[in-house]
């Protein structure tokens, strides 16, 4: 029993440290309260694709790209987070189910790449994009990276921003920092939304 326990702890430690070792998109924290923090991001380079009614196909396409399925056959280091957002009009109620629309998934590229030097995708379903910087309100949470968990925390974030009279300018984004083998209690997830902040 003790050997099994030591083995499980070792596995948990291994996967937790893999996540820590990945390059993370940089930002500056400019305000913090008990519920959320305000971050400022610079422009970032990402590869993105879309998927209707699910996320597995989108993830596979993006993972193949960083694994060398690009014009220069370049293998690219994985970074965090992987983000998912829904492609719907701003007039659509935020209460719409996240998985009901066309989902956009992004892998952010390592900082060493620029728009001119980023390996071009082989698949027409993928595109290299510049994600414009700006101010974001972010709420962190652990547990499984499910839509239900994301929607629950997004609601908490939106209600807190409304109470604080902070205007949002987009729909919430789901940010995932760990792989599926990371124990759920060690996972880091975030719901983030672009805001007007002066």
Task: Please describe what each predicted stretch is.
Residues 2-198:
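A solvent-exposed interaction/effector surface
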